[in-house]
Design a protein with these regions (language model features):
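Non-catalytic, conserved peripheral segments adjacent to functional cores
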Residues: 2-138, 158-195
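Conserved metal-binding segment of the jelly-roll/cupin
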Residues: 135-158
Length: 195
């Protein structure tokens, strides 16, 4: 049953992609994704493992092999590929960004991240779903985030965290929307989860 107007914040429409944030009545972290093939993973999000090759000198890891896997399929012919890195201090929250056109490809290279994903796509079967994915040094995964999926993170632990990411187009501020970390409709619990 579609959400009522009072339960939705419209975020815009472009290229047949309509986005809206659905009110979440209970503060939570949504579905925690523990396996790349989880049935709760938001549709269109892809997770792949990163293999580290350690030896006595350190380790080597391939971050992306463009066009060689499901995660990077189609990027080999991309004329506007951009590679960036973000470094964040412990406890930093970079709240939700979303795009109408841009696809993000993330791989952590240092530290640990609590990644938050929210399906903002009105026509998605998972509209309103929220995922939490812990990734980084202790869970080396690559992540593909399609247009219409809000994404953000919190750095967990005591170390600086670094994220390398590809985008399938150059940064365009007109393609990006943002939601504050404490948005009442998102109702995400950023606090440590004591169990």
């Amino acid at each position: 049953m579609p959400a009522s107007v009072e339960e939705v914040v419209p975020l815009g429409e472009r290229n047949d992609l309509q986005l809206a944030l659905v009110r979440r009545p209970t503060k939570s972290i949504g579905d925690v994704i523990l396996q790349p093939d989880s049935p709760h993973l938001i549709e269109g999000v892809i997770i792949e493992g990163v293999t580290h090759h350690p030896d006595d000198r350190g380790y080597f890891a391939e971050l992306f092999r463009v066009g060689a896997s499901k995660l990077t399929a189609g990027l080999a012919q991309c004329p506007t590929l951009q590679v960036s890195v973000a470094a964040s201090y412990p406890g930093t929250i970079k709240a939700l960004h979303y795009h109408f056109e841009q696809t993000d490809y993330w791989v952590p290279i240092q530290g640990m991240f609590q990644v938050v994903l929210c399906d903002l796509r009105i026509n998605s079967n998972m509209h309103g779903a929220v995922n939490t994915i812990y990734l980084g040094l202790l869970r080396p995964w690559r992540l593909k985030i399609p247009p219409g999926v809000g994404h953000g993170y919190k750095v967990v632990g005591q170390d600086l965290a670094m994220l390398t990411y590809l985008t399938d187009r150059f940064y365009n501020p007109q393609d990006e929307g943002r939601l504050p970390y404490d948005h009442a409709f998102l109702n995400y619990d950023w606090e440590l989860q004591h169990k």
